[in-house]
């Protein structure tokens, strides 16, 4: 999957972001870029229209769709084109994500493109470098991606998607060519979305089995997300600002009593230390977490981004299998089951939270509506299917 993804990203470097628009509107910098990779090429509306049709036509094979772009863009002659892809890997250069990306360098070079892949252990720094233009694209969590692209960032909304199968259907809809325009937001375009599993509540005391019982406890919240602190305060708990790396350490060291995290973090981040001896994991998913590849729209045209998004989607089952292998490492004794009535209460509270965050401009209303449609597709008896508020 990674080879195909990197290859598609490479091809996208050969095309100006706006050169494919039907009105063929380009900035001076984009014209200069195009002249470098395809000297003498004149783009007509007819050529752009044909390319766009081929790029979004899922009845064609990926090589056929890519070939249309290659013929139009041409290849650079002599000078290498350079782009920077920044990769957030908690283990940095020794991490599996960064290592896999580095392995593709020889594949990329044959396209006449030099890609500088930079590992980041700090998601905050990566995000700032993407904003400043030091990164042409960045791999980050969906929670962070919301700062760049509210529509895709809302996929990680609290209670928005209850399980893996619903997540699959949602991503199929999100990544469909008919939805391509929604994947561009100003200066940024979504190049890919991958599932990272459901987030659960980890506690250091099994008595904290409900939101009401979290009152007076310390809860880790992301320092860049003020709404998390607001929600925690509303249930009478104390928010403790953290980043995505320090939060697990605070939980393991007893600085915070409650931590929301995906199950894959259990072994990797040694969260069993924070739960020992009397803690556990509340068996109720808070949200479906994603990893998202966010690119600068002046560097990556949406036509190529569509192919990359589809490459991500095609590997949904493989990713979920690997996530399952990791989550299977969580011993059964850690699970805390909660009564059905409490689960229903949680669903109501999460819906209220989504509505509140939507009205504040934090969540995208179109994505929330799509998530509701997915939930109702699986269970039409839900009250929200009769009287929708999202």
What are these regions (language model features)?
Residues 1-5:
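Positively charged n-region of N-terminal signal peptides that target proteins for export
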Residues 6-16:
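Bacterial N-terminal signal peptides
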Residues 17-21:
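Sec/Tat signal peptide C-region and signal peptidase I cleavage site
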Residues 27-78, 107, 128-131, 141-234, ...:
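Contiguous mixed-secondary-structure segments that line small-molecule binding/active-site clefts
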Residues 71-97, 115-119, 216-220:
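Short, well-ordered beta-strand elements
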Residues 113, 130-140, 237-238, 253-262:
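Alpha-to-beta junction loops
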Residues 114-128, 223-226, 238-253:
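Short helix-initiation/N-cap motifs at beta->coil->alpha
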Residues 142-152, 248-253, 259-283:
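A ligand-binding cleft/hinge motif common to bilobed small-molecule-binding domains
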């Amino acid at each position: 999957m990674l080879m195909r993804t990197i290859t598609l990203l490479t091809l996208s470097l050969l095309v100006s972001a706006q050169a494919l628009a039907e009105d063929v509107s380009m900035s001076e910098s984009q014209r200069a870029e195009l002249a470098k990779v395809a000297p003498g090429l004149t783009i007509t509306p007819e050529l752009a229209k044909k390319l766009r049709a081929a790029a979004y036509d899922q009845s064609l094979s990926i090589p056929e769709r890519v070939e249309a772009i290659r013929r139009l863009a041409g290849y650079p002659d002599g000078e290498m084109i350079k782009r920077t892809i920044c990769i957030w890997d908690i283990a940095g250069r020794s991490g599996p994500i960064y290592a896999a990306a580095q392995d593709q360098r020889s594949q990329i070079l044959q396209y006449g493109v030099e890609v500088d892949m930079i590992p980041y252990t700090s998601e905050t720094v990566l995000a700032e470098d993407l904003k400043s233009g030091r990164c042409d694209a960045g791999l980050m969590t969906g929670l962070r991606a919301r700062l760049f692209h509210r529509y895709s960032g809302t996929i990680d909304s609290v209670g928005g998607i209850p399980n893996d199968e619903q997540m699959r259907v949602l991503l199929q809809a999100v990544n469909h060519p008919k939805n391509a325009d929604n994947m561009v937001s100003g200066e940024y375009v979504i190049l890919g979305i991958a599932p990272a599993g459901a987030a659960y509540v980890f506690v250091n005391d099994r008595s904290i089995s409900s939101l009401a019982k979290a009152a007076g406890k310390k809860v880790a919240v992301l320092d860049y997300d003020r709404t998390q602190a607001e929600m925690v305060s509303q249930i009478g708990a104390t928010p403790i600002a953290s980043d995505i790396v320090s939060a697990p350490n605070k939980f393991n060291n007893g600085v915070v009593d409650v931590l929301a995290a995906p199950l894959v973090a259990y072994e990797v981040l040694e969260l069993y230390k924070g739960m020992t001896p009397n803690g556990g994991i509340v068996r109720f998913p808070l949200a479906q977490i994603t990893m998202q590849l966010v690119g600068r729209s002046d560097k990556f045209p949406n036509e190529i981004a569509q192919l990359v998004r589809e490459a991500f989607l095609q590997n949904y089952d493989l990713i979920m299998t690997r996530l399952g292998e990791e989550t299977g490492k969580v011993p059964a004794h850690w699970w805390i089951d909660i009564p059905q009535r409490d689960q229903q209460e949680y669903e109501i509270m999460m819906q209220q939270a989504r509505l509140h965050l939507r009205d504040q401009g934090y969540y995208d209303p179109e994505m929330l509506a799509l998530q509701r449609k997915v939930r109702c597709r699986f269970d039409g008896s839900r009250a929200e299917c009769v009287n929708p508020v999202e």
